[in-house]
């Protein structure tokens, strides 16, 4: 698999403030890569350096095999971009604006603009200035997707969209990936990353604090384990859990012949299973962690909770 985006030792400073601290990032072609982080983590700065909107203080960047600075207009035509703060010409109608942008971005197949607008529920006949924030966001999505770019760079792309349109957007992202396009998706809506991304990087204070498949973040997270066991004393189970590593919020209670156990496991749940295995396990429930829990836990452990 080829690499669509690669950064090495990427730094960006604004005076005395350092926004990016030596960012090393690799995005494989034909994948959806999620970038998660709180406000001020460096997500937008990262995207803008990839597009040569701002220049890094130091470090190397390669996008679609070229330097963003040297690639110029030819490289930009291969990229679809939705900025976090969308500014559109308000004096024209949506259809006219998109046709004008199509002349800049490159060939757009006949009917594509209308098809995308229909999927997103966008009225192209209305002047842009009369559109709501959500409908302006739909315009931004259409202009990014309409020329079938090799790379989609999407900064908080569902801002202002209702749940049904968000679902359609996620379908568009998956279709783009299936067609061989690469998608870099920056979002604080963690369910989007969970549903759409193959891999993810978590940014905190300009640094990557975790990176890998979305499933790996779930594994690293906190899980709640509940069990009912027999044939063992509650004190024995409680002592075993107290001696195990990575186990928190333990609650062990006897109820007749039953012992009810509840505990939080950080990462692997095996220590909990071992602790209750002295008895007969009658019931066992493991609450699979949501990505949101994983990310909040990572923020907390890296002093970057927001």
Give the ranges of each region predicted by the language model:
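Alpha-helix N-cap/helix-start and coil->helix boundary motif
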Residues: 11, 95, 190, 234-235, ...
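C-terminal coupling/interaction segments
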Residues: 264-306
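Structural motif
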Residues: 149, 245-248, 267, 279
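ABC transporter nucleotide-binding domain
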Residues: 169-264
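Hydrophobic alpha-helical segments typical of transmembrane helices
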Residues: 97, 112, 116, 236-237, ...
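ABC transporter nucleotide-binding domains
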Residues: 2-7, 12-210
């Amino acid at each position: 698999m080829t690499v669509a985006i690669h950064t090495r030792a990427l730094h960006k400073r604004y005076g005395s403030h350092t926004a990016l601290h030596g960012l090393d990032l690799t995005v494989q072609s034909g994948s959806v890569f999620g970038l998660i982080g709180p406000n001020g983590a460096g997500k937008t700065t990262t995207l803008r350096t990839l597009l040569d909107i701002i220049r890094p203080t130091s470090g190397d960047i390669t996008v679609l095999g070229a330097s963003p600075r040297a690639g110029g207009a030819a490289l930009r035509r291969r990229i679809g971009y939705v900025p976090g703060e969308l500014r559109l010409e308000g004096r024209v109608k949506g259809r006219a604006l998109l046709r004008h942008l199509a002349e800049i971005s490159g060939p757009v197949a006949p009917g594509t603009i209308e098809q995308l607008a229909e999927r997103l529920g966008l009225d192209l006949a209305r002047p842009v200035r009369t559109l709501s924030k959500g409908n302006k966001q739909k315009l931004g999505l259409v202009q990014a997707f309409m020329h079938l770019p090799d790379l989609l760079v999407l900064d908080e792309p569902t801002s202002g969209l209702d749940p049904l349109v968000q679902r359609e957007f996620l379908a568009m992202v998956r279709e783009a990936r299936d067609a061989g396009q690469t998608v870099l998706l920056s979002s604080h809506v963690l369910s989007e990353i969970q549903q759409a991304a193959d891999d993810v990087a978590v940014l905190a204070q300009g640094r990557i604090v975790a990176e890998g498949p979305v499933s790996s973040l779930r594994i690293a997270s906190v899980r709640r384990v509940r069990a009912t066991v027999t044939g063992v004393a509650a004190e024995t189970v409680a002592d075993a859990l107290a001696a195990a590593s990575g186990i928190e919020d333990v609650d062990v209670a006897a109820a007749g012949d039953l012992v009810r156990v509840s505990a939080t496991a950080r990462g692997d749940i095996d220590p909990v299973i071992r602790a209750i295995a002295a008895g007969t396990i009658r019931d066992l429930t493991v609450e699979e962690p949501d990505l949101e829990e994983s990310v909040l836990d990572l923020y907390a452990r890296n002093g970057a909770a927001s």
